[in-house]
Amino acid sequence: MTLGYLYSKFFKRVLRGNSILNSVIAKTAKVYSGSTFYDSKLGRYSYVGYDSEVINCEIGAFCSIANGFITGGAKHPLDWVSTSPVFYNVGSGTGHHLGNLPIEKTAKTIIGNDVCIGSRAIIMQGVNVGTGAAIGAGAVVTKDVPPYAVVAGCPAKIIKYRFNDDIINKLLKSQWWLMDDKILKSIARYVNTPELFLSELEKIKSNVGGGKYKELNASRFFFFATSNSYCDRRMAA
């Protein structure tokens, strides 16, 4: 845990800002106040609600994350004599150290595209959440979540899938979340009917020939946030 991270916690709690550090945020994405967003990425049109803590996590496009979400927190060594961080080489909760033992870095959490996460849900570090999944409020997710699965509970379990296998496979194959805004605007009225949406999408792909519809150049949609103030710069290609 670095000095910058500890500063970001102070900024969030005392000044009620949204503390963003060493992260990449899409220009059309948003992290709400009271939240810590550290060593992470947030895709276009995604948002993270108030009072959330996101550490070492990659979040795709079009994700809706409610207030109080937590992922990527510190992992304490359960097989050591003590779980206290005063004995290893990260920031200590007390500000004091009795040792400097190395400890394995927390695994990165991956959240796909168009994922919906309910209020105060927790996703354990290193978990992969598939595109289109929905996480219930207060859920504790300890295992990978398949695409378009709906999970809830503690520990979270699969309740159902949002669509049948055919629709899920077609949506995943379409990768609609990579499309240019102009294309998405032209078919936005079909979002509430998956079959029509996919049908119209196929027409668009056919009209431009060979299915080579325009996809996004990610460098157009991101800026770096390397401190508590935004820095409007494009990503390297």
Give the predicted meaning of each segment.
Residues 135, 153:
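Conserved G/P- and acidic residue-centered "switch" motifs that form tight phosphate/ATP-binding loops
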Residues 75-77, 145, 161-162:
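Conserved catalytic-core motifs of eukaryotic protein kinase domains, centered on the activation segment
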Residues 14, 84-123, 155-237:
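C-terminal segments of enzyme domains that contribute to small-molecule binding surfaces
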Residues 10, 14-15, 30, 37-43, ...:
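Flexible, glycine/small-residue-enriched loop-and-beta-strand segment within the central core
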Residues 130-133, 146-148:
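Conserved catalytic segment of ABC-fold P-loop ATPases
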Residues 117, 143, 152:
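HATPase_c (GHKL) ATP-binding subdomain of two-component histidine kinases
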Residues 1-26, 237:
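Membrane-proximal basic amphipathic "stem/tether" segments
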